[in-house]
Amino acid sequence: MTDAQMADFGAAAQYLRKSEKERLEAQTRPFDIRTECFVPDDKEEFVKAKILSREGGKVIAETENGKTVTVKEDQVLQQNPPKFDKIEDMAMLTFLHEPAVLFNLKERYAAWMIYTYSGLFCVTVNPYKWLPVYNAEVVAAYRGKKRSEAPPHIFSISDNAYQYMLTDRENQSILITGESGAGKTVNTKRVIQYFASIAAIGDRGKKDNANANKGTLEDQIIQANPALEAFGNAKTVRNDNSSRFGKFIRIHFGATGKLASADIETYLLEKSRVIFQLKAERNYHIFYQILSNKKPELLDMLLVTNNPYDYAFVSQGEVSVASIDDSEELMATDSAFDVLGFTSEEKAGVYKLTGAIMHYGNMKFKQKQREEQAEPDGTEDADKSAYLMGLNSADLLKGLCHPRVKVGNEYVTKGQSVQQVYYSIGALAKAVYEKMFNWMVTRINATLETKQPRQYFIGVLDIAGFEIFDFNSFEQLCINFTNEKLQQFFNHHMFVLEQEEYKKEGIEWTFIDFGMDLQACIDLIEKPMGIMSILEEECMFPKATDMTFKAKLYDNHLGKSNNFQKPRNIKGKQEAHFSLIHYAGTVDYNILGWLEKNKDPLNETVVALYQKSSLKLMATLFSSYATADTGDSGKSKGGKKKGSSFQTVSALHRENLNKLMTNLRTTHPHFVRCIIPNERKAPGVMDNPLVMHQLRCNGVLEGIRICRKGFPNRILYGDFRQRYRILNPVAIPEGQFIDSRKGTEKLLSSLDIDHNQYKFGHTKVFFKAGLLGLLEEMRDERLSRIITRMQAQARGQLMRIEFKKIVERRDALLVIQWNIRAFMGVKNWPWMKLYFKIKPLLKSAETEKEMATMKEEFGRIKETLEKSEARRKELEEKMVSLLQEKNDLQLQVQAEQDNLNDAEERCDQLIKNKIQLEAKVKEMNERLEDEEEMNAELTAKKRKLEDECSELKKDIDDLELTLAKVEKEKHATENKVKNLTEEMAGLDEIIAKLTKEKKALQEAHQQALDDLQVEEDKVNSLSKSKVKLEQQVDDLEGSLEQEKKVRMDLERAKRKLEGDLKLTQESIMDLENDKLQLEEKLKKKEFDINQQNSKIEDEQVLALQLQKKLKENQARIEELEEELEAERTARAKVEKLRSDLSRELEEISERLEEAGGATSVQIEMNKKREAEFQKMRRDLEEATLQHEATAAALRKKHADSVAELGEQIDNLQRVKQKLEKEKSEFKLELDDVTSNMEQIIKAKANLEKVSRTLEDQANEYRVKLEEAQRSLNDFTTQRAKLQTENGELARQLEEKEALISQLTRGKLSYTQQMEDLKRQLEEEGKAKNALAHALQSARHDCDLLREQYEEETEAKAELQRVLSKANSEVAQWRTKYETDAIQRTEELEEAKKKLAQRLQDAEEAVEAVNAKCSSLEKTKHRLQNEIEDLMVDVERSNAAAAALDKKQRNFDKILAEWKQKYEESQSELESSQKEARSLSTELFKLKNAYEESLEHLETFKRENKNLQEEISDLTEQLGEGGKNVHELEKVRKQLEVEKLELQSALEEAEASLEHEEGKILRAQLEFNQIKAEIERKLAEKDEEMEQAKRNHQRVVDSLQTSLDAETRSRNEVLRVKKKMEGDLNEMEIQLSHANRMAAEAQKQVKSLQSLLKDTQIQLDDAVRANDDLKENIAIVERRNNLLQAELEELRAVVEQTERSRKLAEQELIETSERVQLLHSQNTSLINQKKKMESDLTQLQSEVEEAVQECRNAEEKAKKAITDAAMMAEELKKEQDTSAHLERMKKNMEQTIKDLQHRLDEAEQIALKGGKKQLQKLEARVRELEGELEAEQKRNAESVKGMRKSERRIKELTYQTEEDKKNLLRLQDLVDKLQLKVKAYKRQAEEAEEQANTNLSKFRKVQHELDEAEERADIAESQVNKLRAKSRDIGAKQKMHDEE
């Protein structure tokens, strides 16, 4: 805009845009783009600098402060050239980066230009001062301006939203966001001001609203803001007028854009501010406005003073604000109430409740003595507040101190402490203020609601900005959460939806992730188990506190969510309990009192008093609040329940916020970003780090980037074509129908713009930023040029008319002057004087004769005039009828245009669907490629697995030798499995057959459809040929030779195309061979897959058998272990006996030592006893050794069997895994092969479709070629006719010239006669009179001829113009047909390789046409018969298609059943995965237990060593026993008793062995039963497998059984381990028993020593006993060795278990990985299969429908083309006739010119005769009398010529009648065409271009028809004129003859 245009903004211009001079100075400042840059700075973020040098990736620069810095090269950012200084749209910056945006805003802010565009949204910086940019002058200047036509402003954003609402018919919203103190409220007020100014309702509405002491609606909308600000705004740390509530103002408009109504929604009033403020803040403005003493009557009414410090609720912070005048604001608030229609009672109620809240804060309470209850400490303030609220003061105090609480069904009076009372007062004050505020909003909405119709709205959102204070509580969390949601909405709209729009429209676009997703923080707050959810949960628990809430927050989110952190508490600051990372920064929150704030409880006793208040407003506020009393009564009376009062603050806020977001999503948003320049509220100062932080958080840079990279402007194709066609009308011709998209493409490609700045979508054209503005400028410039040209032409035409009048005046004056001069020259002649004297006296007979002749001539002229009038009336009637027919045709054309538009819309819809389907196909192809890659990987794995499988087969052969015992069971189960596999194979074969049948049916279906299409094509072509033959029989008779020539040309083209056809057939054969090869490969793959499946099933059976064997061995091991335990118990008993005996032996040895000198008798007795004792001991030792040997053998056997079975299981598991992998790979290969086959089938179908389309095109080209040939023939015939007519006209012209020469000679003879009659005065007088009369008549005739000449010249010019136009059209038609023929031949040459066969068919059709010319009726009947046959075939094919559809549905049902079974197997697979995970945990437990067992083993080793040492000590003691033989006698009796006991113990051991054997037998029986049960279960499982009929189920079952076996084996190992630990414990007990027995034996030896002294006789026996004891020692040593062997075996077993555990862990990991892999593959394959099946079916159906409709439309379009060609032929005929008439006209004009020339010569001769002529006339009168007879003869000849000319005129009239007949024929043809076009209405969807060309041709024909009618009218008028002229000439000739 220039300075003159900026003058419209008045004083605001300098704050919106700098002057041209200042801008020019700024742009011409010195600037070096290579050195000017930005460098980072610690304090200022970025500073301007100049580059001094560059060294090794470092840059040395000098800042503008003179400081030299060295930075990395990638940290240096270029400055923009000076032309971009203070640019209004930052998206236009050359170098877009953070410092460029920052300094642009900073420089504009320094110049007080606070508004700046940033791509699609606007950025505004708070100026902290008043600027004159919002007055009415600025509003008027911005009204109706485009964004690019005016400087940035909030008014421009508002006007754009208003215009979008009117043009797009869509609701709009303006989101004004920013941090607290950024200026949101001011901008909101300006937006409302703008809408109220520009869209005000009419005068009637204003008068109506002005009634009842109210303002107009726009005034009420504006005044709602100060009323709400007084009660909802307050001073905060960052803002003196901060909105402490959010509001969404909806301004409703009518259909014409007039203001209709408005409403306001509010969110989250900060009610805690009513009772508490920080030091630097203050309460809501209304309190201080009331206390300003501007209205003293208010202070008296409210019983308050004007000192705020007298009231605790309003004096906790500051009480005054420098920038706010409370007294003036009070008057504004009061007047706003009046404008909004508040009654005086309502105003008084609002003020009273506000004053009562102030008194509430002054109420004092104290604690009763010796009680915790509170009592009032004075009642003055309570009395005041109760008075203002309409309550009883005593009831109020009682309700506060002793509220009634419902306990069960009874009410109890509860005592309150002082703290509780104060809290209750605060809660009541907050509730009263909040409800009063909400009531005010409702009341204002009721005022703003009008009954006028409303259609659209513009919403303005002003909500509390992001807040980070020193003390952040629950209110700050809610506010910040709201801002987080709004920022997320902005990000989603700007970055996600914008890019999704590009994808949806098919524009090539790479998705850009701007990293602006805030969903994590939002989920942390609002999702289940988020902060709000935990707060709600804690509010429901009665014993919950703030600390429990904190603990739950920490447990659920600390360390788990990145946005939740633990704060760092700093001394001197408020305590914080948790921190949240918001988009605008990290905020520390204090949770004290959150539970109470969320629940917001009220004293129900006081609330009940409120409901009964005498103040109407107070009772209204709490009428809907449900207390315990009202809740009970409500149940019986049907009143409102208490549920609403239980809704928490957080839940209510989230509900309102969700409603707001829903409303915003339904509108078109416009964003305004408000920025805080500094924290000090200093005008003109910008804090770079603060502003930079806000820009980063608000996504300003990202918004600019996507605006630059993306396409922010988009227009529908139809709208763009309609609006911008004026830029180049030639690109989109007026008479043609062109698709909107194609027209847009042509238009844009023809314009001189950057073609990379726009993209074409499916439905819209997309523009980069700035291009649409450039197009608008081009359009405005074009309009101005067009209007200027029109004005110039109009002025020129007016001046030409004026000039013509001036020339006419000049010519008239010249004629008058010439006549006067001639008269003056002859008036003094004697003869003239005599003539003047004699003329009045002469009354001769000549005059009478002349009068008679004149009368006769008048009669003739009158008759001709009547005839011409009758002829004219007839022609006028015909013209009226023709005009009527023309109008009818135009109406029909308009209807057809509407139908074509509908067809175009349907075609656009089909194109959209096609594009969507193509996208789906592309996606499916990508998935197919991924599957092929996976297939390649799986084939590689398959090869590896095959190698491993060969190795495993060898291992299996080795294992089969060890499994001879279970071979019988194996064979039995194998037979069963074989049966199952055979059945499964049978099922697979059935499925394969079904698939083959399905494919065959599909192919048959496709073939049937193709045949049907071919037959339909034949029917259509035959019907077309029939119509053509019926219409062109007459034409074909005269053009047989032309057709023969065309046929020869086509035959040559046919021979060319036949070779190409052979090539295409060979390629098709190659494709079919490839198809057969692929089918064979597919069959081989299926056979391999079946073989692999059978192998897998065999391996699975083998694994099951091995698992059964393992179970049996494990059961057997358990039985052996039980036997081993029994043996151990028996051995323990024997050991106990042995220890007793050894103890007795020691006692005997001691006694023997004491009785050393015993007798030999005693010695012998001792020997006998010793021998018996030794025998018993040997028996016992042998029994124990035998038991130990058997136990060791069993253990070893068990360990070996366990190891072997474990290895077998491992091998089988590996084999099974490999086979499963192979199976999955084969399945994937099978799927790939099937997909390839489907693709090949699709490709073949597409090729067939392409061939059919090309054949159709060849037919069309052939038809067009024939039409072009016929038109050329017509041109040649017309040319010959015109030549003959031209010759005839030339002959006529020569005759007319001869006639004119005769007339001239007659005139000369007359003049000679007059010279001869000089003497005869009377004759001379007669001659003079005759000459005078002739002069007058000649002059009259001259005038008439001049007029006729002018008319004829004009008509000639018109006819020449028409003729030139016709000639140009003929040339255009000729060139068009020639170029079309050339193009068509070129296209035929290009497509000849595919169209030979169709061309041959076309040639045959041509020959058939030539043959049918003679026998048309026979052909007609034959065609009808063929059509009937074809209809029968169509019905058959339809029946076949229906049967195929039925089979397809059955197959789909089978497929659905298989899918269901597969999903069941998937669920079982998931359960097996869970069990595998539980097994892994058990493995870890086993590992720990194993480590503990190793520790126990070490302890056992140490104890074993101790036992060996003790045994050596015992042997030494027994060696000394020989001295104690005497004492052995005493012990003998005891030993016998002990022997008996030992025998009984042995018997018990034998009994226990028998018992254990019985247990073994029972266990074997149970094992057999279990085995039978397992077999039965296996049989049931087999039956289930038979029912399942699927391969995946077997894989999952095998995995499940293997996992179960693993769990059981691990459990068995664990149990064995536990048993071993028990054995070791028992061994420890036995060792302790042995020690104890050794001690007792020592005592016995001491006692026996005394006996040995008495039995020295038995010393020899004692010696033998000593030897026996040595043998016992050897036996003990052997036992020790056995124990060591057992320990070693235990070690081996532990090692074996460890190996098996590791193998099991590895297998478990592999199994889990494979299970996960299979699960993921299965799920992905299932999803892909479902999608592909659904997409495939949809695609097939839609493609078939589209192809069918396309073919039908093409056929109909071809018919329309032929009809249009016929019309073109008729048009050419009409043009020939018009050309003929034009030539006739030229000839007539030439004759008229010659006649006029000769007439002029005669007049000159007559005028210049004078005296000489009179003398000559007198001399030659006699000569002329002689020549008169000859002249009469010549006159007779001229009469004959006249008759000839009349005959020619009759011929011309006949020719015009023929033209009329041609017109009627053309009209009939048009009528037929209209009928055909009506029949083609619904079938022209895929024939847009052809239909468009047809329509354009039709319009041209219609236009030419009109021109032909005009030319016919002109020709008729010319014929009439020629007749009139001929009559005049004949009359004159007769006159001359008579004279």
Swiss-Prot record:
InterPro entries: Kinesin_motor_dom_sf (IPR036961), Myosin_head_motor_dom-like (IPR001609), Myosin_N (IPR004009), Myosin_S1_N (IPR008989), Myosin_tail (IPR002928), P-loop_NTPase (IPR027417), XRCC4-like_C (IPR014751). Keywords: Actin-binding, ATP-binding, Atrial septal defect, Calmodulin-binding, Cardiomyopathy, Coiled coil, Cytoplasm, Disease variant, Methylation, Motor protein, Muscle protein, Myosin, Nucleotide-binding, Phosphoprotein, Thick filament. Residues 657-679, 759-773 are annotated as: Actin-binding. Residues 1826-1837, 1925-1939 have a biased composition (Basic and acidic residues). Residues 85-780 form the Myosin motor domain. The modification Phosphoserine is found at S417, S1139, S1271, S1309, S1512. Residues 1826-1849, 1909-1939 are annotated as: Disordered. One of its GO terms (molecular function) is calmodulin binding. Residues 783-812 form the IQ domain. The cardiac alpha isoform is a 'fast' ATPase myosin, while the beta isoform is a 'slow' ATPase. Muscle myosin is a hexameric protein that consists of 2 heavy chain subunits (MHC), 2 alkali light chain subunits (MLC) and 2 regulatory light chain subunits (MLC-2). Muscle contraction. The rodlike tail sequence is highly repetitive, showing cycles of a 28-residue repeat pattern composed of 4 heptapeptides, characteristic for alpha-helical coiled coils. Limited proteolysis of myosin heavy chain produces 1 light meromyosin (LMM) and 1 heavy meromyosin (HMM). HMM can be further cleaved into 2 globular subfragments (S1) and 1 rod-shaped subfragment (S2). It is linked to Atrial septal defect 3: A congenital heart malformation characterized by incomplete closure of the wall between the atria resulting in blood flow from the left to the right atria. This is Myosin-6. The gene is MYH6.
